[in-house]
Amino acid sequence: MAILKWVFWLTIWAVVAAFFHYTLPQVDIVRVTDTYEKRIDFGNNSMFWSKAGVGNNTALGNRDVFFIQTRRAKGDVMVYRNEDTGWGWPPYFKFDTTNLQAEASDLKSSSGSPQYVALKHYGWRNEFFSIFPNATSMWVVDGPNASKGIPFANIIILTLFAAMVYAIWVRWRRFKRSRIDPTVERIEDDFAERQNRFSSWMKSRSKK
């Protein structure tokens, strides 16, 4: 039972950690190598793509999506999608996809004359499931070792979440101590008393 309890809570916290890792913004220092637009047919991985943008037909099973190709300082390639989030989840309220694509196109550079940018995004890159992180903004930085800045939004959100979890835990402990534990103790005492009575009755029967 103890093992099942640990497995349950580890699973819950793993899901929570994955949720925050996917949803919260992250910053990469990259060099933009190309930008393009591609028609995407959405399948089982559709949950990792944004809904159709404002003014688009939401009933279509495919649509054109902007992409931003980049290369990190260490040489590895990273491809980002560039989609509006609109009023949906996650709540980035992004409506400037076209402007961001134009900005990315203007910041393209070669390895001979690199121009590095800080690219803020959320989501994961997984080649097997064909999912891409979604770019939300970018700005020019001095070089590949430039600071990514302090993630104030992440700190505030995680602090508020931790405070909420702690508050719920404290109230649950108080409720358990005042309501559940006494009830369980009464049930256990009543069961023990009935068991003792039954044992006494059985002993008296055996003596006759």
Model-derived features with residue positions:
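Intrinsic disorder/low-complexity segments enriched in polar/charged and small flexible residues
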Residues: T11, V15, K51, W89-P91, ...
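Extended, hydrophilic extramembrane loops/domains of integral membrane proteins
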Residues: E103-N145
